[in-house]
């Protein structure tokens, strides 16, 4: 019996699951809206909500805990400088999940997970990985 076990396994090892949620939470912080499968979105929401709660309390300890979770310094900086102050007065419920139909290839239920009161201009700015020299030149 599986009573009392929280979360889904997604046919992945623990390390793979943790890395997947770290990457997905970094992508959500970066773009403030991502499209994924519905079960992944449902399991991603508590991870991101805890990160936003960390972002509301700007301390060295909270920054280290966030860095251990998402492993991207730029996204940690955005978490504490943009998202934390934005949701300072909101006691919880920072994300919303909207169903988005079914994927064509395997009919998997899809969902859009986004921040409540998100910045609509944050979406679509990613052009892939860039080198440090081109980022400093711009």
UniProtKB/Swiss-Prot annotation:
Molecular function (Gene Ontology), one example: structural constituent of ribosome
Pfam family, one: Ribosomal_L17
An individual GO BP term: translation
Disulfide bonds: none
Assembly and oligomerization: Part of the 50S ribosomal subunit. Contacts protein L32.
Family: Belongs to the bacterial ribosomal protein bL17 family.
Name under which the protein is recorded: Large ribosomal subunit protein bL17
Organism the protein comes from: Methylorubrum extorquens (strain CM4 / NCIMB 13688) (Methylobacterium extorquens)
